[in-house]
């Protein structure tokens, strides 16, 4: 559904619900209330996708369907569904539910369908569904359930569909399914089940679907029954495979012979399990009824703990709240430690029922208040530590049940006072800590000093913080008479026993007694924190313009008088005075109010005086003062009232005085009633007078005769409603449509109560500011405009907005506060803009958002956009359409599915991206122009003198800018279009002297020398062996002055240069390298090798002798060090460890002497390793470990009659087996391996099956093959790539076959568990190096090996140089194409001529250019051939020289791949499908298919799955009536 229609649908549903509610009022009892934010229709309650954290209250008792899916509910309590006796369908899927209290469903007697999938349930409580006998469908899939207790499903005997797949189930207790006799569908796939008891499925006679695949079944003698059971029911339990023992791994359970199901012991008992024993939370440890979760990084209290625990330790975590009933079910708890967390919220019943609890430790948290009743019932508690929190008050009955408490610590909190009697219940208290609290030692704390003097139990030294006279003095040592109250202190702390400490006087205000005076302080809003004791609030003479509905008066029960005179109030929001029932006097004199109505004064039920003097009120209507029945004095003096409608004062039943003076009354027929009313009531102050018509001017209204109140030519009334729909728009109820009207601003006359506004397809360049006044809007469509920028708080007043459509505009930047205030927004569409980045925090206020459209935006996915990736993944609010555009490694990746760690910042961000939020950063203003941001034009330039234009690039005097290049002279000229002409120096030409003619076109360079163009000349670059200005002289490199051979080497002249014949001991092209003969020396006993020319000598340690120091001195041990006789290979270093020699291997080598090379790194483009062939037995496997960050490549390849390939494809491992006698078979791994870490890959061949196992996960099988795949003697194995000469000739190629080699590391290759040694690399294995490190020398290109230890770089387009670090020069710069376009061809260019021109430089005009003017093409277009002749290119369905003949209706067969989208996976047919297209003429009829048939095709998907679908194919075409 499109976002725009979603809003319409919501409006229709809302109106339908309203109509149903009205019908209910007229025809029966009053409608039942609906929970806040939910939608109720008939017996259905829809609360899905609202971000709810708990089940809402107030669900109608008659509800039959309840949708609570896609919220954030974490716990289901006993009271959540109490009383819902008619409920039949309950949806709770896709929440965060981890705990369901026993008895949560006890009232749901009629429940038939319950969905709890996609939650976080770990344990299923027994007897949970005992009270839901009519349940027929139960979905518990995609949770974290670990075990199924015996009584889990007791009571639901009618259930037909039970889904338990995709959990962590490893234990199913005996009898768990015994009562489910009507069960038809049971899903247990994708769990951890290893054993199933023989009685599990015996009581399911109606079972027709059973899924057991993707488990860990152990096929021993105890599972033999399942094989028989499945063989008798071939349609159920398909693909159920054995995972152990090893010799049965991958076999179908039903296909294994009974004799193979054996146990080690002949009479072993079937293993049993206990579902409750596995309920210890995964990060914790459980032993001796103690649960230890210390320092595990927990964010919440673990659920489903072992029921018999006596102690739980949760300190040093990140827990923020203790939910309701968190520990209630653990009745044996004695000790709870939750110290050093982040707890700020504790439910009142968190510790309810813990009568055995003796120790409760809560120190080091962020607790600000102890809720009422938190410690009630903890009669055994002896230790309570509340220190190091932020507790600011304690109710007098907080500790009422703690008679046995010995130690109480309130040290280091925010307590200012303590209520008298707080410690009275603590009969056993021995130690009390109160220090480090900011105590206010006034009259209310006098009792504490007396208490501590009588009971010296406070040992921490509690002191006063204020007042100053008592600051820093010990409370227990201060005399009672010094504790006294003064000023407003008594009001502030009077109710401290109820945890109420009144607020201090607001900033900028003055408080005296109960008067709060905030007048004349330039305030723009009412202070948000006012003391509760205030009775007189003075806010006059400020700058308040709008009275917001903040609920401030609900907190002021003592308020009697409000003075808001002399402000700038233009609007009073509905509900602004809610809770102000005690207010008796309201002054609004001297403001700018134009209209008022009864809803404005809602809440002022006790108001007696209302002053509205000196405002701009023009009309008093029937509802202006509705609800003000207590008002006695009303002043409307000095307004602009011209009309008062009859009955305007009827609701003012207590009115005794009204002032209507100084108003311009229009005494026409609309005011005739007022004169009679004034004469009758006699409560008016003064005599209000007429101002219109002229003949009644200044006459008192009550004196005007009734016949003089006429409307002849004077029907004006200020109370008449203005038109409710703008001219350019159409309106229906509260929906206004102004689409495609060419609007550049919001039209005037927009109804204030509009709920849906459609402004798409106009020319708006910014979001109209006037929209902020339309507070009832629920949908705004601003798509297909020209809006280029949003501002902060653009939509902050639109609290009801649920749909905002900004697609297909020119948005480049999203300010961080642009969407602030949109807490009701559910759909936000930003599709099709130019947004590259979204600042973190932009969506903080979008708490109700369920759909975000960000597609077709050039997102720059670096580390600054990582938060958005995490946010999108957490809530699945973006449907997987938004793609990254940059940086290059992230291009075309999906925002939803790309791993978060790939969002990285590397190097500076392109200035064009940064400048989207500040266009001035790209320095668009030239010639020292000053740049300023502009919300419409993006930027504006203030140009210096002599320049003009948008970017200050146009000179007022064209020659000031020196447009002539290369020293040309500028001349002002009116005859040229640019206003100037250039006189060029010798060697340059062109309008601006920008062209350097190519002097090499006619050069005299000889011997294939390269000509380099200069300025009016050229230079010849000679090849080797030639010199001279024209390279016409041969060089003799062996003459003494040119001989480059070093170290007495012999120079030998060659045809193309020379070579050096080195003397022994030297090497290199010029014999420049002195060979180090010590590289392979044989010096022993630690002797030092000294290199000499063509040899070396050994410098022996003292006492040793011989050429190689091989003779030890007499009378000494031959071995002075264990390493002396221990030779490490491959350059390894020998070290002594515990008196034993040990080799420290270089990267990639292993073995006792580092003799084996087990890790190699593939860095070249065509790198590979060839392994010697070995016959693989019928039971064999190949395993290896890989590490890479690339998406594609060849891991392993076997080429013979049965080609086999193990490939890296889009980050997954793909196994392809291509027997030439059958279609190729492919299987994909679920796991991705391109994260740079090592992953294990195993290929198992067993009994004509081929299985792929990645990271020891679930095997992926190719199924039963026609014959056993094997690696023959003559079929080599290639790792990391294949020889370029071999290609993939033996393996049939598909469109997605990765032809490139593998880039990364391969480690520990084993064939039949035999570790392979890479040490003797074949000579063709180029670009393969020991160890694991990547080739990084090529800056902008790929490595390609040329020698064993050498690589060359293949550069990406636009880069050149040996290391691809030089930006390539565009060969088209300075091109000489006259009438054509320059096209680069490598380092040169060619000219693509315009029509009518030819030649190498497009400088020859063809005479046939206008030949098409006389050559008519009836159904096609005329073109000129290469020979200059005209010809017709016909439209489809026509032929002939002039396209005059209509082709008959025929079918043309094309072959192409058919594609389908399946979720987030893209699927395509395995081969191209022949498709017939009908083309040709049929006169008045149409060329259409006349016969077709359907055929099944196999579709393969990118996620590794496949499916079969029927596709319709056309067979014949003919002429039929057009449909």
Curated annotation (Swiss-Prot):
GO terms for cellular component: extracellular space; mitochondrion. The keyword Lipid biosynthesis does not apply. InterPro entries: ConA-like_dom_sf, Cys-rich_flank_reg_C, Cys_knot_C, EGF-like_Ca-bd_dom, EGF-like_CS, EGF-like_dom, EGF-type_Asp/Asn_hydroxyl_site, EGF_Ca-bd_CS. Its main location: secreted. Residues 918-953, 955-994, 996-1032, 1034-1072, 1074-1110, 1119-1155, 1340-1365, 1368-1403, 1408-1444 form the EGF-like domain. One of its GO terms (molecular function) is calcium ion binding. Keywords: Developmental protein, Differentiation, Disulfide bond, EGF-like domain, Glycoprotein, Leucine-rich repeat, Neurogenesis, Repeat, Secreted, Signal. Residues 1158-1332 form the Laminin G-like domain. Disulfide bonds join 284-293, 441-464, 443-485, 505-511, 509-518, 667-690, 669-711, 920-931, 925-941, 943-952, 959-970, 964-982, 984-993, 1000-1011, 1005-1020, 1022-1031, 1038-1051, 1045-1060, 1062-1071, 1078-1089, 1083-1098, 1100-1109, 1123-1134, 1128-1143, 1145-1154, 1305-1332, 1355-1364, 1372-1382, 1377-1391, 1393-1402, 1412-1422, 1417-1432, 1434-1443, 1449-1487, 1467-1501, 1478-1517, 1482-1519. Residues 1449-1523 form the CTCK domain. Glycans are attached at residues 72, 192, 563, 622, 784, 792, 797, 928, 1008, 1025, 1181, 1247, 1406. One of its GO terms (biological process) is axon extension involved in axon guidance. Pfam families: EGF, hEGF, Laminin_G_2, LRR_8, LRRCT, LRRNT. PROSITE patterns: CTCK_1, CTCK_2, EGF_1, EGF_2, EGF_3, EGF_CA, LAM_G_DOMAIN, LRR. Residues 215-265, 437-487, 663-713, 857-907 form the LRRCT domain. LRR repeats lie at residues 62-83, 86-107, 110-131, 134-155, 158-179, 182-203, 308-329, 332-353, 356-377, 380-401, 404-425, 533-554, 558-579, 582-603, 606-627, 630-651, 753-775, 776-797, 800-821, 824-845. Predominantly expressed in thyroid. Residues 34-61, 271-307, 496-532, 716-752 form the LRRNT domain. It is found in: Secreted. Residues 1-33 form the signal peptide. It comes from the Eukaryota. PANTHER family: PROTEIN SLIT, SLIT HOMOLOG. May act as molecular guidance cue in cellular migration, and function may be mediated by interaction with roundabout homolog receptors. This is Slit homolog 3 protein. The lineage of its organism: Eukaryota, Metazoa, Chordata, Craniata, Vertebrata.
């Amino acid at each position: 559904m499109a976002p725009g229609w979603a809003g319409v649908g919501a409006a229709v549903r809302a109106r339908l619900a309203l109509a149903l509610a009205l019908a209910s009022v007229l025809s029966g009892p009053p409608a039942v209330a609906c929970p806040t934010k939910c939608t109720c229709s008939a017996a259905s309650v829809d609360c899905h996708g609202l971000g709810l954290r708990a089940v809402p209250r107030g669900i109608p008792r008659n509800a039959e369907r309840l949708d609570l899916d896609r919220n954030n509910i974490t716990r289901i309590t006993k009271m959540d569904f109490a009383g819902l006796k008619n409920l039949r369908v309950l949806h709770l899927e896709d929440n965060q539910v981890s705990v369901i209290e026993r008895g949560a469903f006890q009232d749901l007697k009629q429940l038939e369908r319950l969905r709890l999938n996609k939650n976080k349930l770990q344990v299923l409580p027994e007897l949970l569904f005992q009270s839901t006998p009519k349940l027929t469908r139960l979905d518990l899939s995609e949770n974290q359930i670990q075990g199924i207790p015996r009584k889990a499903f007791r009571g639901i005997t009618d259930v037909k569909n039970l889904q338990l797949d995709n959990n962590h189930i490893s234990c199913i207790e005996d009898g768990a399914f015994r009562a489910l006799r009507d069960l038809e569908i049971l899903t247990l796939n994708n769990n951890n089940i290893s054993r199933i008891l023989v009685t599990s499925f015996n009581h399911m006679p109606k079972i027709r679907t059973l899924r057991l695949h993707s488990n860990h079944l152990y096929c021993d003698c105890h599972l033999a029954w399942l094989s028989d059971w499945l063989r008798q029911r071939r349609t159920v339990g398909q693909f159920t495979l054995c995972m152990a023992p090893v010799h049965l791994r991958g076999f179908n359970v039903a296909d294994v012979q009974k004799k193979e199901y054996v146990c080690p012991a002949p009479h072993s008992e079937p293993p049993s399990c206990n579902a409750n024993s596995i309920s210890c939370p995964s990060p914790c440890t459980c032993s001796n009824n103690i649960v230890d979760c210390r320092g595990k990084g927990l964010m919440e209290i673990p659920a489903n703990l072992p029921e018999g625990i006596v102690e739980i330790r949760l300190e040093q975590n990140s827990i923020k709240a203790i939910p309701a009933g968190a520990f209630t079910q653990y009745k044996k708890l004695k000790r709870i430690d939750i110290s050093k967390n982040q707890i700020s919220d504790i439910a009142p019943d968190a510790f309810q029922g813990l009568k055995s609890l003796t120790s409760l430790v809560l120190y080091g948290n962020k607790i600000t208040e102890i809720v009422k009743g938190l410690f009630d019932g903890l009669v055994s508690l002896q230790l309570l530590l509340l220190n190091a929190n932020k507790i600011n008050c304690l109710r007098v009955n907080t500790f009422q049940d703690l008679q046995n408490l010995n130690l109480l610590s309130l040290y280091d909190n925010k307590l200012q006072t303590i209520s008298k009697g707080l410690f009275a219940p603590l009969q056993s208290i021995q130690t009390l800590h109160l220090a480090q609290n900011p105590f206010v030692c006034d009259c209310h704390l006098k009792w504490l000093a007396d208490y501590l003097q009588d009971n010296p139990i406070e040992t921490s030294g509690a002191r006063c913080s204020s007042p100053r006279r008592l600051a820093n003095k010990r409370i227990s040592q201060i005399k009672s008479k010094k504790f006294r109250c003064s000023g407003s202190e008594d009001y502030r702390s009077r109710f401290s026993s109820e945890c109420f400490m009144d607020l201090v006087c607001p900033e900028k205000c003055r408080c005296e007694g109960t008067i709060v005076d905030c007048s004349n302080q330039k305030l723009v809003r009412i202070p948000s924190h006012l003391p509760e004791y205030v009775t007189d609030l003075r806010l006059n003479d400020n700058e308040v313009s709008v009275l917001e509905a903040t609920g401030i008066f609900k907190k002021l029960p003592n308020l009697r008088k409000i003075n808001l005179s002399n402000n700038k109030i233009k609007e009073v929001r509905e509900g602004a005075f809610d809770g102000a029932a005690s207010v008796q006097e309201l002054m609004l004199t001297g403001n700018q109010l134009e209209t008022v109505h009864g809803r404005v004064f809602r809440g002022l039920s006790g108001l007696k005086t209302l002053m509205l003097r000196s405002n701009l009120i023009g009309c008093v209507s029937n509802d202006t003062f509705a609800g003000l029945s207590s008002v006695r004095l009303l002043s409307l003096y000095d307004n602009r009232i011209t009309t008062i409608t009859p009955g305007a004062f009827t609701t003012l039943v207590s009115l005794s005085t009204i002032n209507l003076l100084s108003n311009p009354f229009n005494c026409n027929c609309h005011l005739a009633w007022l004169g009679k009313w004034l004469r009758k009531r006699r409560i008016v102050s003064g005599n209000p007078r007429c101002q219109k018509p002229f003949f009644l001017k200044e006459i008192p209204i009550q004196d005007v005769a009734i016949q003089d109140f006429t409307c002849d030519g004077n029907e004006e009334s200020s109370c008449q409603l203005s038109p409710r729909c703008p001219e350019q728009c159409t309106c229906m109820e509260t929906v206004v449509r102004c689409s495609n009207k060419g609007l550049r601003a919001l039209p005037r006359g927009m109804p204030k109560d509009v709920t849906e506004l459609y402004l798409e397809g106009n020319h708006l360049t910014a979001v109209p500011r006037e929209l902020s006044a339309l507070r009832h809007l629920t949908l705004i469509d601003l798509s297909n405009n020209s809006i280029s920028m949003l501002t902060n708080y653009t939509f902050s007043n639109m609290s009801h907005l649920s749909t905002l459509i900004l697609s297909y505009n020119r948005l480049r930047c999203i300010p961080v506060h642009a969407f602030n205030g949109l807490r009701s927004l559910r759909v936000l569409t930003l599709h099709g803009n130019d947004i590259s980045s979204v600042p973190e925090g932009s969506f903080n206020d979008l708490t109700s958002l369920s759909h975000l459209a960000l597609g077709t935006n050039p997102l720059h996915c670096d580390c600054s956009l990582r938060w958005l990736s995490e946010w999108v993944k957490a809530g699945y609010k973006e449907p997987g359409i938004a793609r990254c555009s940059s940086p290059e490694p992230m291009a075309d990746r999906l925002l939803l599915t790309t791993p978060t760690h790939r969002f990285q910042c590397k190097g500076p961000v392109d200035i064009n991206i940064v400048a989207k939020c500040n266009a001035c950063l790209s320095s668009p203003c030239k010639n020292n122009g000053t740049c300023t941001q502009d919300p419409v034009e993006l930027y504006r330039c203030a140009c210096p003198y002599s320049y003009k234009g948008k970017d200050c690039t146009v000179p007022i005097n064209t020659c000031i800018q020196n447009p002539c290049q290369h020293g040309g002279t500028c001349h002002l000229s009116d005859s040229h279009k640019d206003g100037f002409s250039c006189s060029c120096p010798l060697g340059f030409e062109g309008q601006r002297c920008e062209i350097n003619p190519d002097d090499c076109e006619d050069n005299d360079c000889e011997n294939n020398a390269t000509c380099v163009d200069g300025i009016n000349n050229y230079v010849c670059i000679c090849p080797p062996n030639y010199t001279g200005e024209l390279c016409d002289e041969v060089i003799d490199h062996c003459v003494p002055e040119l001989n480059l051979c070093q170290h007495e080497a012999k120079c030998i002249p060659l045809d193309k240069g020379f070579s050096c014949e080195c003397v022994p001991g030297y090497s290199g092209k010029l014999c420049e390298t002195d060979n180090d003969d010590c590289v392979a020396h044989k010096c022993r006993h630690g002797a030092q090798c000294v290199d000499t020319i063509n040899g070396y000598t050994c410098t022996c340690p003292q006492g040793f002798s011989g050429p190689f120091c091989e003779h030890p001195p007499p009378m000494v041990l031959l071995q002075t060090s264990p390493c002396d006789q221990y030779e490490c290979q491959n350059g390894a270093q020998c070290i002594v460890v515990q008196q034993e020699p040990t080799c420290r291997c270089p990267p990639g080598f292993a073995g006792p002497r580092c003799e084996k090379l087990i890790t190699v790194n593939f860095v070249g483009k065509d790198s590979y390793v060839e392994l010697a062939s070995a016959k693989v037995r019928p039971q064999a496997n190949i395993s290896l470990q890989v590490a890479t960050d690339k998406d594609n490549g060849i891991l392993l390849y076997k080429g013979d009659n049965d080609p086999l390939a193990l490939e890296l494809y889009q980050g997954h491992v793909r196994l392809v087996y291509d027997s030439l006698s059958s279609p190729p078979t492919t299987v994909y791994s679920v796991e991705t391996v391109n994260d740079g870490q090592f992953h294990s890959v195993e290929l198992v061949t067993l009994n004509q099956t081929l299985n792929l196992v990645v990271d020891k996960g679930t095997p992926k099988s190719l199924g039963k093959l026609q014959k056993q795949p094997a690696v023959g003697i003559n079929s080599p194995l290639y790792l990391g790539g294949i020889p370029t000469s071999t290609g993939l000739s033996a393996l049939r190629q598909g469109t997605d076959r990765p032809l490139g080699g593998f880039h990364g590391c391969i480690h520990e290759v084993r064939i039949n568990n035999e570790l392979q040694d890479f040490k003797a690399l074949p000579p063709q294995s180029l670009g393969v190096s020991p160890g694991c490190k990547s080739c990084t020398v090529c800056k902008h290109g790929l490595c390609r090996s040329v020698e064993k230890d050498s690589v060359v770089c293949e550069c990406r387009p636009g880069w050149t140089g040996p290391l691809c670090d030089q930006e390539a020069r565009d060969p088209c710069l300075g091109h000489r194409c006259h009438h054509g376009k320059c096209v680069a061809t490598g380092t040169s260019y060619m000219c693509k001529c315009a029509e009518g021109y030819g030649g190498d430089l497009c400088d020859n005009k063809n005479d046939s250019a206008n030949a098409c003017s006389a050559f008519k093409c009836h159904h096609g277009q005329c073109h000129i051939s290469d020979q200059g002749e005209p010809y017709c290119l016909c439209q489809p369905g026509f032929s002939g020289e002039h396209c005059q003949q209509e082709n008959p209706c025929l079918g043309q067969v094309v072959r192409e791949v058919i594609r389908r989208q399946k979720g987030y996976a893209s699927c395509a047919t395995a081969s191209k499908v022949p498709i017939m297209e009908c083309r040709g003429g049929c006169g008045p009829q149409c060329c259409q298919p006349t016969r077709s048939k359907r055929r099944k095709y196999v579709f393969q998907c990118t996620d590794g799955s496949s499916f079969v679908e029927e596709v319709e194919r056309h067979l014949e075409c003919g002429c039929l009536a057009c449909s």
